[in-house]
Amino acid sequence: FLILIGASLFWYGKKREGITYMAVLIFSQIVNFQTKAFFSLPRPTSHEALIMANETTAGYPSNHAQNGIYMFSFLAWIERRISLSVLLGICIGISRVYLGVHYPSDVLGGWMFGVAFLLSTTTLIEALEEKRLIRFHDTVGKRVAFTFLFAFIIFFFGAEPEFRYKVAPLALSAFLVLSFLEMDWRVPTRTRLVVALVMGGAGVIVLRAGLKMLFPATIPFDTLRYIILGAWIALVPLLFLKLGVAEKKT
């Protein structure tokens, strides 16, 4: 779901925002996993709270709180609308305490990490816009080098094997395709945006489920499945342009 939010921004034509969001989101998951492993703080026990969900990882910081405040606040920053989105992010953190799976300190820690990654993302985007950093469209070689470096970090510092063999291939595939896709586009109307999101999302669902039934349940084929998904996310704007759903920026 969190990756689809970034894909949706990308499909909308907010290329820089979507790519930066996904890269920072994936990096934030690595930091969350490593922080949990470092502190190894326990979650509430049945003697302290009514536990309504099953969790097996350490408690601090709350990943749900971190992701919630990061995702909704970033969307609010893009649209320059703060109140509702930030409120939703806060509610996710509060719900984790209500479900008995986190202490308030876990949630506060998650919020702090989420805000830190939000500020990192917005600062990076603004720096890219002002060309204070290497532009995303600078050279193909730089983009390819960054892609492989990013995939290396995900694979060796990521969390469980599922993260390494699914998220890393998806990100590598999507970013690698984008390294050679030198164009900008926009979806001019809300109606066309809905069509673009339905087309892109339906493709992800069909490919993910269809290839799962077609391929054997092994790590190499799971990796291949997510490589194909990453390529679809990056290439589907070409279909939008072909069908007139999107138009090239001049």
Task: Give residue spans per PLM region.
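Short helix-capping/hinge motifs at transmembrane helix termini and TM-loop junctions
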Residues: 12-13, 39-40, 100
